[in-house]
UniProtKB/Swiss-Prot annotation:
Keywords: Signal. PANTHER family: LONG CHRONOLOGICAL LIFESPAN PROTEIN 2 (PTHR38425:SF1). Residues 1-21 form the signal peptide. InterPro entries: LCL2. It comes from the Eukaryota. This is Long chronological lifespan protein 2. It comes from Aspergillus fumigatus (strain CBS 144.89 / FGSC A1163 / CEA10). Belongs to the LCL2 family. Probable component of the endoplasmic reticulum-associated degradation (ERAD) pathway. Disulfide bonds: none annotated. GO terms for biological process: ERAD pathway.
Length: 122
């Protein structure tokens, strides 16, 4: 008889702990648990262009100021890519250039695909 009470009590404690874990999961998923949330809450940057405009206006350049990187270059097609580790710069031939994702291609493959697309072959 004592053994059945111990089993029953053990099963009840097990079910209670599973239920508690489930409620903590849902509370965390749906915005509860505010104590932890306030510690990790950081201010996101504004979604307007005011910060960019301040940087633009504060940059000294007597040549061409690249809009994507704020680099000062002689000609627009000399602008560097904003993310050179993952982008290739492809000059289009009429004084313009584009930065495209390397996308895991072999070196020069992205430029080749752009050239094929410009010729209507892709």
């Amino acid at each position: 008889m004592l053994s059945s009470w111990v089993r029953c009590l053990g099963a009840l404690l097990f079910l209670a702990s599973v239920a508690q874990a489930q409620f903590q999961f849902f509370e965390h998923m749906f915005g509860g648990g505010h104590q932890e949330h306030h510690q990790q809450n950081t201010q996101n940057s504004a979604s307007d262009s005011a910060r960019y405009q301040q940087l633009w206006e504060g940059t000294n350049c007597n040549k061409y100021l690249c809009p994507g990187t704020l680099a000062c270059v002689d000609f627009p097609h000399h602008c560097p890519c904003a993310h050179p580790n993952v982008e290739d710069k492809v000059e289009l031939g009429e004084g313009s250039a584009v930065c495209i994702s390397k996308g895991g291609y072999k070196p020069g493959e992205a430029a080749r695909k752009i050239e094929l697309a410009r010729k209507g072959l892709l």
